[in-house]
Amino acid sequence: MIDLSLRPRAWSKVARKANALGPLDGVAEDSANVTARVATAASLATLPIINTKPEGFETRAAAKERCAHKIEILRKGNAQEQLLAEKLGRCRKDDPCNSGACDVCLGNYRLWLYRQSLPIFAARHNWTRASVIPAGFLKAFDGLPNVDLSALASMIDKRLARSSLRKRLAFVGIDISLNLQDNEIVGWQLHLYMLIEGENTLRLQEAIKAAFPPEPTAKVPHKFDEVNDPSNRITYLFKAIFKRRSRYTDANGRPRTKGLPLKDSDLRELLPFLDQHPIGARLILRGIRRNGSRLVIINK
């Protein structure tokens, strides 16, 4: 096991030094070369702790303001929702609530993920982003309380473990949107954003498609692109803001999709669901694991 949680001064500096060590696709190299290069990248990243944030990252004040709006909505709900409002209202910097429904705590978690992922990206420089809407991930409105997020994450992990991509590193985030068609609710759509080690090849795409067959109602169930700097994508993979996705046909007969804010009734279903799971339950790691407050690459 190679500990890659050492804090880099800046992504660009560490990446330049790590890439100077030579090519690595994470699959073809023998284990000795992988271990040596990863260890060297880790030693290059032994720099003072940083306070850097991704460009455009939400401020704590903005997160608190959005959370305050949610608290107002929950206070008008049932007993469970009112208890959640109290929990979120008690959240403090020195005593965080660690709720998956708390914008401030989610922001802290996303920032931790960003910083911990930097040396991993420095060690493995070829990455592909995949957006996946799998069959069976569409849930009825009012049905979120019946979703076992832990079991869902385990299923995603097992599907990747059984695929030809099982030896590659991967970050997988579960996102949630409320889908509408012509202003009629279709349901809660759980979907995946992945950052997976390796170039954006046909082989990688076909492996993802085989592991996650498409949702029949999705217009574009699989989307792939090469990632030059995965550090810019990691926070997008684990989102803190959830939306309605409204599909319609415009005046020219072309299909369109518009992102809209969730309504109060939507939030009263979503927020208790997020609260009942650990804050990192929507994140699946492959070839990487959490060791205390650090992320480490697991050598196999």
Q: Which residues does each predicted region cover?
A:
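Right-hand nucleic-acid polymerase module
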Residues: 1-188, 198-300
